[in-house]
Amino acid sequence: MPQQLETTEHKIAGSESDASFVKPLRVLMIAPSLDMLGGQSRQCARLREQLQQEPTLEVAFLPVNPRLPGVLRKLQAIKYVRTVVTTLFYWAALLLKAHKYDVLHIFSASYYSYMLSAMPAVLVGKAYGKKTILNYRSGEAEDHLQNWRTALPTIRMADVIVVPSGYLVELFARFDLRARAIFNIVELDRFSFRERRPLRPVFLTSRLLEPLYNVGCVLRAFALIQKRFPEASLTVAGEGFLRAELEDLARELHLRHTTFIGGVAFDKMPQMYDSADIYLTATDLDNMPSSIVECLAAGLPVVTTDAGGIPYIVTHEETCLMIPRNDHNRMAEAAIRLLEDQELASRIAHSAREHCRKFSWATVQSEWLNLYQSQAHENAEEHRYREDGSRKNAVGVE
């Protein structure tokens, strides 16, 4: 459903008797909509869908990338102009809506995304006296915190910092920032586990076509794989400004059976995973990529680099095969190893499926609910303290 400028609200209706005793906690989730494919938008959509079933919550959504109304939408097709007008409309909606909620749950990446989307939400939340949860999700956190002057002082203004992995907890601690880890969620029932016997040389990669994700390394590895398995195929799912350059590289490498299919909608990814037999990712820097966990759930063996937080979520030879960054030779060797040792591939796939249960909603649910309720309780205590202070001051004046 299209995301409009106004927030999309969903009040959870409990029984009339419940409503008379318990006032739902009002939470505003602030993140990119699914118009902007990526980890933030997908995680927000998943979390929102689950939280909207909780009778103790009233959840609303404010997209940081609103679709503008009427003729103004044409401005969003103009490079640079779209950033200005979209940001201004988001800021206006933020100012108009944020005061209605008890807790602002703010999804955040790094750099300009943080400065234009998350930072204003933290500042507005503080101005309105609301509790703010900064859900920071970027694998580029170290460079962001170290080199952007606005980052540390404004991140410290958030009441709670939540990150999706122990990797970022440790990284934030180096900057004297206290963060807590709550895993990304994966709805296991969306992914059908498929036993891949025999394991075919049918490969998939599905990262953004940008330098950070080093899809060129995957293509170079695949060139070596095709020398051993000439019938091997590779599907490259994802968009990005490097697409033309990567397509040129595929031609230079004389790759066969290699298809660039562009971005894939969130609800189509289970079919993509099911169509492949091995997943390749060569990212140079990452946090907790949901794509890897989704592969585990689907029984799709993964060959991944050891970048960033990835070793915090999977283990070499237990739930994946892990290689050093930017090493296409090692990636090809690992993929060929799976194809030539199908017992290893099967063992990894089954172990990975069990491992990924820790990322299910049943595991993560209580952590989010307890966090929301603790923030609401603190807000109530602070409000009561201010009221008591006002009464004492009034008595003193009399």
Regions found by a protein language model. Name each.
Residues 155-192:
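Donor nucleotide-sugar binding/catalytic pocket of nucleotide-sugar-dependent glycosyltransferases
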Residues 247-264:
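Nucleotide-activated donor-binding/catalytic signature segment of Leloir-type glycosyltransferases, i.e.
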